[in-house]
C-alpha cells in the first residue's frame, strides 16, 4: 500500500509487525463460512493477511485517503468497504442469516471504550470480538474483583460478556510508536447475562455512583441508594470497598434498590436536562 500520513485526530498508530499480526489471526480460529468485519483497517496490516485466510472481508473505515487506497488495491468481491464512523455504524446489517458476526480490529485508543459499548449494544448479532487496545484498558476489561484495575469498565463489560487477555504488544510494533503498551483482548458476549439486571440503566448508574468513593466503604458511596436493610437482605457486607464487589453483587444491589429521587428527577423526560447520563 502507498504511503499514508497518519492523522492525529483519528488516533492512528499503524501495526507493522507481521509476527504479531499472524498471532492475532491465529487466535481467531477462522472457519469456513465465518463473516468477519475489521474496524479501522488502516494501511491493511491485518486486512491483507486476513484476506489470505478468507474469501471475503468487511471493513469499516472513516479516513477517506485510506479508503481510496484500499479500493485501488482490492475488488468489491473480496473486500467490502463501509465508509463510516464505527461509533455510528449498525453492525447488525452485516450479520448473515445463519451465523453471528465476528469482529476484529486494532482500535484507535481515543474511541476504544465507547466503541466497545456501542458493539455490546448490538451483541445479539456478534459471536466474538478480538481487539488490540491500550494495555491499561485491556487490564481493566479483564480485571477481577479485589484488584486495582477492577472498576466501572470491568463490571459493565463483564456484565455483558466474557473478557480474556490474550497477549502483550510492545510500542515498537506500531508506526508511529504509541507512548503506551498495547495488548490483545477477546470479548465473547453472553447469550444472556449470568446475573440479569431488572434495569440495566439503573445498574450502570449505581456502579458509577459506587465508584465515586472508591477507597471508602460502599455504604458511603451508595448512602442514598441502598439502605442498611437492603445490604443485609442480599447478604453483602456494606463495609467492603466498591472494588471488592463482584458483578453479581452489583446486580443484586441494583435489583433491590432504586435511585434517589433527585437522580430520577434529573433524568425524567420533562426536565430541561432530559438526556440522562450517558457516561461510561
Curated annotation (Swiss-Prot):
Residues at which S-adenosyl-L-methionine binds: 13, 15, 40, 61, 85, 106
GO cellular component assignments: cytosol
Cited CDD domains: AdoMet_MTases
GO molecular function term, any single one: 16S rRNA (adenine(1518)-N(6)/adenine(1519)-N(6))-dimethyltransferase activity
Keywords from the UniProt entry: Cytoplasm, Methyltransferase, RNA-binding, rRNA processing, S-adenosyl-L-methionine, Transferase
Matching SMART domains: rADc
Region (Disordered): 258-280
Main location: cytoplasm
Annotated compartments: Cytoplasm
Swiss-Prot/TrEMBL catalytic activity: adenosine(1518)/adenosine(1519) in 16S rRNA + 4 S-adenosyl-L-methionine = N(6)-dimethyladenosine(1518)/N(6)-dimethyladenosine(1519) in 16S rRNA + 4 S-adenosyl-L-homocysteine + 4 H(+)
EC number: 2.1.1.182
Domain of life of the native organism: Bacteria
InterPro entries (UniProt xref): KsgA/Erm (IPR001737), rRNA_Ade_diMease-like_C (IPR023165), rRNA_Ade_Mease_Trfase_CS (IPR020596), rRNA_Ade_methylase_Trfase_N (IPR020598), rRNA_adenine_dimethylase (IPR011530), SAM-dependent_MTases_sf (IPR029063)
PANTHER family: DIMETHYLADENOSINE TRANSFERASE (PTHR11727), DIMETHYLADENOSINE TRANSFERASE-RELATED (PTHR11727:SF7)
Family membership: Belongs to the class I-like SAM-binding methyltransferase superfamily. rRNA adenine N(6)-methyltransferase family. RsmA subfamily.
Role summary: Specifically dimethylates two adjacent adenosines (A1518 and A1519) in the loop of a conserved hairpin near the 3'-end of 16S rRNA in the 30S particle. May play a critical role in biogenesis of 30S subunits.
Protein name, UniProt field: Ribosomal RNA small subunit methyltransferase A
Organism this protein belongs to: Alcanivorax borkumensis (strain ATCC 700651 / DSM 11573 / NCIMB 13689 / SK2)
Taxonomic lineage: Bacteria, Pseudomonadati, Pseudomonadota, Gammaproteobacteria, Oceanospirillales
Gene that specifies this protein: rsmA
Amino acid at each position: 500500500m502507498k504511503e499514508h500520513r497518519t492523522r492525529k485526530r483519528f488516533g492512528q498508530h499503524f501495526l507493522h509487525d507481521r509476527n504479531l499480526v499472524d498471532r492475532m489471526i491465529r487466535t481467531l480460529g477462522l472457519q469456513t463460512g465465518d463473516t468477519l468485519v475489521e474496524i479501522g483497517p488502516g494501511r491493511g496490516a491485518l486486512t491483507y493477511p486476513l484476506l489470505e485466510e478468507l474469501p471475503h472481508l468487511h471493513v469499516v473505515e472513516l479516513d477517506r485517503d485510506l479508503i481510496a487506497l484500499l479500493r485501488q488495491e482490492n475488488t468489491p468481491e473480496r473486500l467490502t468497504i463501509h465508509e463510516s464512523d464505527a461509533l455510528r455504524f449498525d453492525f447488525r446489517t452485516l450479520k448473515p442469516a445463519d451465523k453471528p458476526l465476528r469482529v476484529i480490529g486494532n482500535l484507535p485508543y481515543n474511541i476504544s471504550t465507547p466503541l466497545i459499548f456501542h458493539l455490546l449494544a448490538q451483541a445479539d448479532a456478534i459471536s466474538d470480538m478480538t481487539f488490540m487496545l491500550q494495555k491499561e484498558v485491556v487490564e481493566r476489561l479483564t480485571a477481577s474483583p479485589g484488584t486495582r484495575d477492577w472498576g466501572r469498565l470491568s463490571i459493565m463489560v463483564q456484565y455483558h460478556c466474557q473478557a480474556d487477555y490474550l497477549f502483550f504488544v510492545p510500542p515498537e510494533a506500531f508506526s508511529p510508536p504509541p507512548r503506551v503498551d498495547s495488548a490483545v483482548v477477546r470479548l465473547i458476549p453472553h447469550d444472556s447475562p449470568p446475573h440479569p439486571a431488572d434495569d440495566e440503566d439503573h445498574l450502570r448508574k449505581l456502579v458509577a455512583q459506587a465508584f465515586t468513593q472508591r477507597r471508602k466503604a460502599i455504604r458511603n458511596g451508595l448512602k442514598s441508594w441502598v439502605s442498611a436493610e437492603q445490604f443485609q437482605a442480599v447478604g453483602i457486607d456494606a463495609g467492603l470497598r466498591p472494588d471488592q464487589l463482584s458483578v453479581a453483587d452489583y446486580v443484586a444491589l441494583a435489583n433491590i434498590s432504586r435511585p434517589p429521587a433527585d437522580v430520577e428527577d434529573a433524568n425524567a423526560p420533562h426536565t430541561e436536562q432530559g438526556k440522562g447520563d450517558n457516561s461510561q
